[in-house]
């Protein structure tokens, strides 16, 4: 390929966008638009690359894909084949992971308000539960007694991260990382974690395994992850000193960003996102130093990357409709995709780089500024002030890096059906999510018979 957007997505000698061995134009013709397209081999490449980066620096590392980024069972099967576990949030993601054959020993269940059905399924299956409150600790113990099987549990810590009180977040704007992280609903402060551990150690129905924390993506500054590791290890040392219990594993969650030079993420600021090696070096070096400092041995390190693994595995193909120009050279290019399909554009001012599928590496002289807009009854700006080659009705535009939080967040505003998803492996292209129909969109509605009567 004459230009690469990722290892398996790029531009061929004709200037066409290709996903592995398939021309994006052919995929749009064969499967219709809008269309999510995923590269199987890019998924495999990413898992292997991040695993290699971490294990080269800290061999006892387990990769748990954050399923909320892309919970398609076909995608989950690929992660299984590559040896990755999974982080699940709620009954649906847990059920899909187990349905896809994920090793329960590599699955974690998260959530701040877990219900009995999902907790019971986790206990029965041997999935580890990240406890979010003292109340949940007792609830899980009772459910385990009813099931007749010990439940594996980790307390979810609510770290203070005071070192980050003066560090400005990239997103959301105007927030410092430390106070912002402390303001969310997840996890327990130290005294509750201590009491949770006491109760778990005293219970015949709870198997206390490790500690869990997830800070999320606030900044591309690697100091965020160093601070999480330092404080998580310090909490582990305090628990050892007070209880005589040492965590067998430390889960530091996700929050690993991903970016490209053309831009990605909130306000396009993930151009500066660290790569896998930079993340691994920062986390592993800090972890090794802190473990040695406190004499905590070598627990299993668990990380939960989502977007960092799934963003660049996919594109969203969309077809051009009306092209409208306003006097003064303002041009709107209407496409059949919308913010329904990439809702982070609306909620986080997310930037997805866009290319013309038939001219994906244009000469600068061919470019003009346009707004790419969708069909919804909102402004529905998919990409403002984008430099694109000339576009006309029927052309195909591709939004890059849509493999994470596209399909999983897609909505049906304006009663718009959601796209299909196709998985490409070499020359092969297979539907892994069927295109929604209008019948699917309206099928749950019910009109009481009395409202059908005239008058």
Language-model regions, residue ranges each:
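Short clusters of hydrophobic/aromatic residues that line enzyme substrate/ligand-binding pockets
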Residues: 9-11, 17, 186, 372, ...
């Amino acid at each position: 390929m004459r230009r690469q957007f990722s290892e398996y997505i790029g531009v061929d000698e004709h200037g066409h966008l290709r996903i592995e061995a398939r021309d994006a134009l052919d995929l749009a013709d064969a499967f219709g638009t809008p269309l999510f397209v995923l590269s199987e081999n890019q998924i495999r490449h990413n898992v292997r690359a991040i695993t290699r980066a971490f294990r080269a620096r800290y061999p006892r590392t387990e990769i748990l894909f954050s399923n909320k980024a892309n919970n398609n069972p076909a995608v989950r099967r690929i992660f299984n084949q590559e040896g990755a576990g999974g982080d699940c949030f709620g009954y649906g993601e847990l059920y899909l992971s187990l349905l896809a054959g994920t090793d329960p020993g590599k699955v974690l269940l998260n959530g701040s308000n877990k219900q009995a059905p999902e907790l019971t399924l986790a206990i029965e299956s041997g999935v580890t539960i990240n406890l979010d409150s003292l109340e949940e600790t007792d609830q899980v113990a009772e459910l385990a007694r009813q099931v007749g099987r010990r439940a594996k549990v980790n307390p979810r810590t609510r770290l203070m991260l005071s070192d980050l009180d003066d560090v400005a977040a990239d997103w959301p704007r105007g927030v410092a990382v430390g106070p912002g992280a402390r303001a969310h609903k997840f996890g327990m402060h130290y005294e509750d974690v201590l009491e949770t551990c006491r109760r778990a150690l005293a219970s015949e129905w709870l198997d206390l395994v490790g500690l869990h924390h997830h800070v999320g993506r606030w900044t591309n500054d690697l100091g965020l992850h160093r601070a999480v590791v330092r404080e998580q290890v310090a909490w582990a040392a305090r628990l050892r000193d007070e209880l005589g219990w040492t965590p067998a594993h430390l889960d530091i969650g996700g929050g690993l960003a991903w970016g490209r030079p053309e831009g990605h993420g909130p306000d396009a600021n993930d151009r500066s996102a660290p790569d896998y090696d930079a993340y691994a070096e920062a986390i592993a070096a800090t972890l090794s130093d802190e473990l040695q400092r406190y004499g905590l041995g070598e627990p299993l390190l668990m990380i939960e990357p989502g977007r960092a693994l799934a963003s660049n595995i996919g594109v969203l193909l969309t077809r051009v409709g009306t092209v409208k120009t306003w006097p003064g050279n303002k041009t709107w290019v209407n496409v059949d995709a919308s913010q329904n399909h990439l809702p982070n554009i609306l909620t986080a001012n997310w930037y997805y780089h866009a290319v013309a599928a038939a001219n994906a590496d244009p000469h600068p002289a061919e470019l003009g500024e346009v707004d790419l807009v969708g069909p919804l009854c909102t402004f529905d700006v998919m990409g403002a002030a984008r430099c694109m080659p000339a576009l006309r009705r029927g052309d195909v535009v591709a939004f890059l890096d849509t493999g994470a939080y596209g399909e999983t967040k897609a909505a049906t505003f304006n009663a718009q059906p959601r796209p299909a998803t196709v998985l490409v492996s070499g020359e092969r292209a297979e539907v892994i999510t069927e295109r929604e129909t209008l019948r699917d969109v309206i099928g749950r509605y019910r009109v009481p018979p009395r409202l059908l009567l005239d008058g």
